[in-house]
Amino acid sequence: MGKISSLPTQLFKCCFCDFLKVKMHTMSSSHLFYLALCLLTFTSSATAGPETLCGAELVDALQFVCGDRGFYFNKPTGYGSSSRRAPQTGIVDECCFRSCDLRRLEMYCAPLKPAKSARSVRAQRHTDMPKTQKYQPPSTNKNTKSQRRKGWPKTHPGGEQKEGTEASLQIRGKKKEQRREIGSRNAECRGKKGK
């Protein structure tokens, strides 16, 4: 007695075989090679199981998953951590020696920082500005002192003259003349008293 098979199964087999025969005639041997190669890699990756991540691959995966938040290599301990707890394993132990999935990687991402309120941003603005350089008085070397005694115009550190230097020089000149006159009068008075 022959095998009993249903009509749809026989039709499927015939149609499938005919389809493959037509395809076989039109496919080149290189196409068949690439098709077989794809099937082998697909089946080997499906049976290999989850992949482990170590070293630079692990860091790249964490950076991709966590983004700007950053990540920890050890699970961050909370405020109430106690020494009685079992030693915690790190991401390397979990993902390098065993398989690791996306949820496990996300556990090591740093928490999102809360958005700052408008008040704290305003209060922080003055601290974000770069510090200005402190004013340094000009050096007091002999040339500068002699220039001041001679009544030369003062200059800013940038080399520019102060506004109104001509007027201030005239005032200084008048004051010097007044001092000389007072000094000469005092000398005359002293000379008369000594006689």
UniProtKB/Swiss-Prot annotation:
Gene3D superfamilies: Insulin-like. Residues 78-89 are annotated as: C. InterPro entries: IGF-I, Insulin-like, Insulin-like_growth_factor, Insulin-like_sf, Insulin_CS, Insulin_family. This is Insulin-like growth factor 1. The insulin-like growth factors, isolated from plasma, are structurally and functionally related to insulin but have a much higher growth-promoting activity. May be a physiological regulator of [1-14C]-2-deoxy-D-glucose (2DG) transport and glycogen synthesis in osteoblasts. Stimulates glucose transport in bone-derived osteoblastic (PyMS) cells and is effective at much lower concentrations than insulin, not only regarding glycogen and DNA synthesis but also with regard to enhancing glucose uptake. May play a role in synapse maturation. Belongs to the insulin family. Residues 1-21 form the signal peptide. Residues 90-110 are annotated as: A. GO terms for biological process: activation of protein kinase B activity; androgen receptor signaling pathway; blood vessel remodeling; bone mineralization involved in bone maturation; branching morphogenesis of an epithelial tube; cell activation; cell population proliferation; cell surface receptor signaling pathway via STAT. The keyword Lipoprotein does not apply. Pfam families: Insulin. One of its GO terms (cellular component) is exocytic vesicle. The keyword Acyltransferase does not apply. Disulfide bonds join 54-96, 66-109, 95-100.
